[in-house]
Amino acid sequence: MTELFYDDDADLSIIQGRTVAVIGYGSQGHAHALSLRDSGVDVRVGLAEGSQSRAKAEAEGLRVLNVAEAVAEADVIMVLTPDQVQRHVYAESIAANLQAGDALFFGHGFNIRYGYIQPPADVDVALVAPKGPGHIVRREFEAGRGVPDLIAVEQDPSGNAWALALSYAKAIGGTRAGVIKTTFTEETETDLFGEQAVLCGGASQLIQYGFETLTEAGYKPEVAYFEVLHELKLIVDLMVEGGIAKQRWSVSDTAEYGDYVSGPLVIDAHVKDNMKAVLKDIQDGTFAKRFIDDQDAGAPEFKALRAKGEQHPIETTGRELRKLFSWIQNDDDYTEGSVAR
């Protein structure tokens, strides 16, 4: 049975009595650090020398150190750098500065699940993973609400890791919404599967094939874009609000009937078989090895796939159409048409 925890189940004073280092200041890093600070926690940010995020963190009133210094000062270390660099950051700046009784926290279980990071046995190892992007985590915290978190404990030599993880989750707003107990393995494997088979890989490929099908049949690219990409948000928002049932309740009878009779023609049984193959590669480490090996080689496959995706005709059409969308807010960190970060 799924275990859920809320504010009354967590003691904020536990994390308030610790010294926290947040390593990284990206999407999740800024949300964690700022919310911890606002919850009365002694927090500092650890960044690599020359990091472009230093000025942003300092401008928001946070104390910034290099990673080794931040870890040496802290007894709770939350690692929020990208998966592919975590093991390097750990080896170069974290491992030598860990002390017995410290707690090593992660926002995603990848490096623990696949053994790229192997902490010493006298250190607590836990996971606190908000189920939303950092700007939403921070926005909801400031509004007095929260985003649900997943929490897990891999090592608990202190006997206090669960209580500490719950306290940390409370400090970033997670227990306001609800915290679900899981494992590093379950969080990592389901997260990767969701990204690859449905949310990112599956959805992106479905949209591109839909666009190609319509334009190859002679329909205008602009009309195809609206029908297979732009309106997707409307459908997903309904699903988020009330599941697939509310989406079907909200659309026309024609759309609902088409959902039932045509959906299984497009997403048929062989797609589920393909999903099982994707899951197997995640479970046995094939995907993780492919990703890390490519990153270690300079990411040639990753860069080639990214460039290919950017060149798809739907991107050209979308760039022109979005100029008409007065309601879209520009993101200062994003360059239109580019996936590179």
From Swiss-Prot:
Its EC number is 1.1.1.86. It holds the Pfam family KARI_C. Pathway: Amino-acid biosynthesis; L-isoleucine biosynthesis; L-isoleucine from 2-oxobutanoate: step 2/4; Amino-acid biosynthesis; L-valine biosynthesis; L-valine from pyruvate: step 2/4. Keywords: Amino-acid biosynthesis, Branched-chain amino acid biosynthesis, Magnesium, Metal-binding, NADP, Oxidoreductase. GO terms for molecular function: ketol-acid reductoisomerase activity; magnesium ion binding; NADP binding. One of its GO terms (biological process) is L-valine biosynthetic process. Mg(2+) 1 binds at residues 191, 195. Residues 1-182 form the KARI N-terminal Rossmann domain. The keyword Oxidoreductase applies. Residues 183-328 form the KARI C-terminal knotted domain. GO terms for cellular component: cytosol. It catalyses: (2R)-2,3-dihydroxy-3-methylbutanoate + NADP(+) = (2S)-2-acetolactate + NADPH + H(+); (2R,3R)-2,3-dihydroxy-3-methylpentanoate + NADP(+) = (S)-2-ethyl-2-hydroxy-3-oxobutanoate + NADPH + H(+). The active site is at 108. Binds 2 magnesium ions per subunit. PANTHER family: KETOL-ACID REDUCTOISOMERASE, MITOCHONDRIAL. Belongs to the ketol-acid reductoisomerase family. Involved in the biosynthesis of branched-chain amino acids (BCAA). Catalyzes an alkyl-migration followed by a ketol-acid reduction of (S)-2-acetolactate (S2AL) to yield (R)-2,3-dihydroxy-isovalerate. In the isomerase reaction, S2AL is rearranged via a Mg-dependent methyl migration to produce 3-hydroxy-3-methyl-2-ketobutyrate (HMKB). In the reductase reaction, this 2-ketoacid undergoes a metal-dependent reduction by NADPH to yield (R)-2,3-dihydroxy-isovalerate. NCBIfam families: ilvC, PRK05479.1, PRK13403.1. This is Ketol-acid reductoisomerase (NADP(+)). It comes from Renibacterium salmoninarum (strain ATCC 33209 / DSM 20767 / JCM 11484 / NBRC 15589 / NCIMB 2235).
